[in-house]
Amino acid sequence: MSRDPFVSYAQNQEDVVLARALRPDEREGFWVDVGAGDPVLDSVTAAFAERGWRGVNVEPLPREHERLCAARPADTNLRVALGATAGQGRLFVEPTEERAWPGPRCSDRPRRVNDGARDR
């Protein structure tokens, strides 16, 4: 277990909050990260991975999934999207390929993000 200073990688320090509760320096652990994204940038699990924790990373975007596979080969990295029912669906990816959602016009997404989205 690591006793190095805890470095936050998460966008809003969610990893710090979790570390206070889960104490990753004192025990081994396991996570399931749905919408894992980049393995370092804004990652809630990067600091835990540095401390020997492993997990399942669910990430449907190809580029992000490839990064996860390269950086976290000991993890289970799944290139899938999760939903309420089994089957196949459509995934709309914004032009920067940083975000995706299950429909062409989700009400919780700004219009500018929906413009130019590609169907995957």
Positions of predicted regions on the chain:
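Phosphate/nucleotide-binding beta-alpha loop and adjacent structural elements of enzyme active sites
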Residues: 1-120
